[in-house]
Amino acid sequence: MARFSRLEVLNAIVETGLVPVFYNSDVEVAKKIAEAVAAGGARVLEFTNRGDFAPFVFTELARHLAQSNPNIILGVGSIVDAPTAALYIASSANFVVGPNLNPEVARL
């Protein structure tokens, strides 16, 4: 379940002016990347759905950020279908981005 409303996500993106995008298959490296980005002033972070274990890494990263840096808004990108979007939403994605407009994903 998302920790931030749609309006909070949008406002944070507008205020920051950028959304860093990344993927790493190693949970510990992903945590370090997220912490470094947060230390650099970014408040919104997009984790891309690119590897076999991406959902697992995302879930662990979301748990970590909820504890260590609860002001970071974590979302997911490279989502092309509704089942994958639902999986990430259930894992605390605050926003979902895809390379195309999929009405099924938008309904979620």
Predicted regions and their residues:
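Conserved N-terminal beta1-alpha1 strand-loop-helix module at the mouth
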Residues: 1-83, 87-91
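Hydrophobic, well-structured mid-protein blocks that either form specific transmembrane helices
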Residues: 83-108
